[in-house]
Amino acid sequence: DQAINITNRIADIEKCDALLVTIPAQSLRTVTISLSDIVPASVPLVIATQGIERGSLMLMSEVMQSIVPPTPYAILSGPNFAREIAEGKPAASVIASHHPQLADAVSFAIGGKYFRLYSNDDPIGTQVGGALKNVLAIAAGIVEGTRLGENARAALITRGIAEIARFAKAKGGREETLMGLAGLGDITLSCTSTRSRNYALGVALGRAGNPQKMDGGRAG
């Protein structure tokens, strides 16, 4: 897509309209520190990285905001497998920001006929859903791998959503955000599809009975 320019030139950051962040969660702090003197405060951040930082327990926006100058940011999250988007198959996602103009600009830039973006103003709840769904997906995979049945998996997912919603509220987000694409949608995809790496890891764990017995599957 011409709306997204991929470059390995650090200097290009100073000229971009917005910076799309896709760095792995546990590497985000190190990379952000290395770029902290380069990223202008005028360049908005679009954070697509999902996760919670080990140790600090910070969300990705919190990690970046603790390092770079204060700048508008948006969170891109939803039930999306990158391969299907690349193949032009229909998909929807969430762009969450306290800055409506930024959310609209991102939607216009990367949305399209087959990729629909819905905006909300709850970046905290959106991030919590995207991060904790990974834990729930592993647990759902374990239920499948140990053959505990569909009833057990449905119960696990339902109670897991309720717990994630409470966590989101405790972090300052809104529980209802978890009923949308960045919560229920992402959880449904990740907890039911063998193409989900976390679900596949859980299945492998359940079948092996012990992490030490795993033969190295699709964890990640």
Positions of the model-derived regions?
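NAD(P)-dependent Rossmann-like dehydrogenase/reductase catalytic/cofactor-binding core
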Residues: 133, 140-144, 169-179, 183-220
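Glycine-rich beta-alpha junction loops
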Residues: 50-52, 77-81, 99, 121-125, ...
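Short, conserved active-site loop motifs that form the nucleotide-linked donor/cofactor pocket
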Residues: 2-5, 115
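Short, glycine- and charge-enriched coil/turn segments that flank and shape catalytic ligand pockets
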Residues: 36, 40-42, 71, 100-101, ...
